[in-house]
Curated annotation (Swiss-Prot):
A motif (NAD(P)H-binding) lies at residues 86-96. Keywords: Chloroplast, Lipid biosynthesis, Lipid metabolism, NADP, Oxidoreductase, Plastid, Transit peptide. Residues 1-47 form a transit peptide. This is Fatty acyl-CoA reductase 6, chloroplastic. One of its GO terms (cellular component) is chloroplast. Pfam families: NAD_binding_4, Sterile. It catalyses: hexadecanoyl-CoA + 2 NADPH + 2 H(+) = hexadecan-1-ol + 2 NADP(+) + CoA; hexadecanoyl-[ACP] + 2 NADPH + 2 H(+) = hexadecan-1-ol + holo-[ACP] + 2 NADP(+); a long-chain fatty acyl-CoA + 2 NADPH + 2 H(+) = a long-chain primary fatty alcohol + 2 NADP(+) + CoA. It is an enzyme of class 1 (oxidoreductase). Disruption phenotype: No discernible phenotypic alteration in the growth and development.
Length: 548
């Protein structure tokens, strides 16, 4: 069933280290290329056909180009996207879905996008495609564009492939793997386990070794032009000062004492030793301990760092781009403002505050909340693909962050804006008199204040001991654990260098900046938090509540 479906569709920390490769110019074409029309040209021609634009407006677009207009072509993003096919992991995740939507909406002549999915059979994979992507509200602009042919278009372009990043050859059946390897131009590594306190064995298998398995598959792809991997800006571990856009290599900016096989052995021994709930608890603790031992905050950033190092060591001559976003939150503009899937890093705290569950937290109000909207991350990735997808074997890192600019978002400002919005527009109909959140500089002060809040609000006093009830203790432990997990971010003071990212923006034409813009300097943080992100977050929360 799987083979028939897919085959049928195929026919329709040295901190100041440097990258080992530089960017080389493309060789000039020695033939007369067919003329490709920009989005502006297409739109004006269409408007003229329907009587909305004058003939002169169209003819002005097709007059011979001057030297100045030639230089305005920018990177050539739309030209690069035409006819390209992709293999995407993590396709049903928050970031990947936004990226897929953008590719489908902006590239009229896109090839196929193969989506690696864990499913028991092709029917289940097709159902996941429909339930999690095709029917998602995120794709409503595409639905408007294609009308009644929307589903047919999506099923023609999006091909679910049964596989698993934790298996050799990605767990794809050989005949399907062979077919895909003949078609794809770009691999987009977007999958991963994002829980900060994940069990160590799972985080190692997916985040550390998964990219290597994907890279090995890519080396067998005949016309692969680029391997693009999404990492995290916090991948460099505990740092102060400026975090540069440099590759991670074991023996250079990752200690040579780190032995991946030894870490896997430790995790395997823990799995054999513990069972049930004890197993999960011990494996989470092991991940935290190993990350701390090597200088990382948690098992997520630690295993993502190993994953980057694996890519760097195994890449060979394959062109590689690493995208390192900071805290990805809801869309700024596209496909519409405020779209979010699930809750991101700061959101559980905001929602708990909105529901009146907490009015205190542990943080430094001056710490940098390095937030970046998801649509800007997608746009940057597309621009980087076009820039580096010419087959030149270079290794480029891009920090997609906001703290390097003059107006970074700080924790205190985020709290102030959240209080302002939630007082004016409460989360639910129940009126809660929200106090301004009190920020504590010590964990002890936060724990004491939260304990008093729980006693006061829920009246869960143990009659015998005068302390918290079992329910109250669980609530206290949950929020204290959350505060500890977020401590590296709520007390973050380093700034991320984004020289490479700035250079990429400068190479883009004006039209490319309008269509694929990701200049963080243009973000109005007050507008984004109050009018975009919080309304989007509330909408997501209420929609999830209805389905529960």
């Amino acid at each position: 069933m799987a083979t028939t479906n897919v085959l049928a569709t195929s026919h329709a920390f040295k901190l100041n280290g440097v990258s080992y490769f530089s960017s080389f110019p493309r060789k000039p074409n020695h033939y007369m290329p067919r003329r490709r029309l920009s989005h502006t040209t297409r739109r004006v021609q269409t408007s003229c056909f329907y009587g909305e634009t004058s003939f002169e407006a169209v003819t002005s677009l097709v007059t011979p180009k001057t030297e100045t207009s030639r230089n305005s072509d920018g990177i050539g993003i739309v030209r690069f996207l035409e006819g390209k096919s992709y293999l995407v992991t993590g396709a049903t995740g928050f970031l990947a879905k936004v990226l897929i939507e953008k590719l489908l909406r902006e590239s009229l002549e896109i090839g196929k996008i193969f989506l690696l999915m864990r499913s028991k059979d092709q029917e289940s994979a097709n159902k996941r495609l429909y339930d999690e992507i095709i029917s998602s509200d995120l794709f409503k602009l595409l639905k408007q564009m294609h009308g009644s042919s929307y589903e047919a278009f999506m099923k023609r372009k999006l091909i679910p492939v049964i596989g698993d990043i934790e298996e050799d050859n990605l767990g794809i059946k050989s005949e399907i793997a062979n077919m895909i390897s003949e078609e794809i131009d770009v691999i987009i590594s977007c999958g991963g386990r994002t829980t900060f306190d994940d069990r160590y064995d799972s985080a190692l298998s997916v985040n550390a070794l998964g990219p290597g398995r994907l890279l090995s598959f890519g080396k067998g792809c005949r016309k692969l032009k680029l391997f693009l991997h999404f990492s995290t800006a916090y991948v460099t571990g505990k740092r102060e000062g400026t975090v540069l856009e440099t590759p991670l290599c074991i023996g250079e900016n990752i200690t040579s004492d780190l032995n991946i096989k030894s870490e896997l052995k430790l995790a395997s021994e823990a799995v054999r030793k513990f069972r049930g709930r004890e197993e999960i608890k011990k494996l989470k603790e092991l991940g935290f301990e190993r990350a701390q031992h090597y200088g990382w905050e948690n098992s997520y950033t630690f295993t993502k760092a190993i994953g980057e190092a694996v890519i760097h060591s195994k890449r060979g001559n394959l062109p590689v781009v690493i995208i390192r976003p900071s805290i990805i939150e809801s869309s700024y503009n596209e496909p519409f403002p405020g779209w979010i899937q699930g809750t991101r890093m700061a959101d559980p705290i905001i929602l708990a505050y909105a529901k009146g569950q907490i009015s205190d937290f542990w943080a430094d109000p001056q710490s940098l909340m390095d937030i970046i909207p998801v649509d800007m991350v997608a746009n940057a990735a597309i621009a980087a693909m076009a820039k580096h997808g010419c087959g030149v074997p270079e290794f480029k890192v891009y920090n997609l962050t906001s703290s390097s600019h003059v107006n970074p978002m700080r924790a205190g400002k985020l709290i102030d804006l959240s209080h302002q919005h939630l007082c004016d527009f409460p989360l639910e109909e129940t009126v809660i008199d929200l106090e301004h959140m009190k920020i504590h500089s010590s964990l002890e002060g936060f724990t004491s204040a939260l304990s008093n809040t729980i006693i006061k609000q829920e009246r869960v006093i143990d009659n015998e001991g005068g302390g918290l009830s079992t329910k109250g203790k669980r609530k206290l432990n949950y929020f204290v654990s959350l505060a500890k997990t977020y401590e590296p971010y709520t007390f973050f003071q380093a700034r991320f260098d984004n020289t490479n990212t700035t250079s990429l923006i400068q190479e883009m034409s004006m039209e490319e900046k309008k269509t694929f813009g990701f200049d963080i300097k243009g973000i109005d943080w007050e507008h984004y938090i109050v009018n975009v992100h919080l309304p989007g977050l509330k909408k997501e929360f209420l929609s999830k509540k209805k389905t529960e």
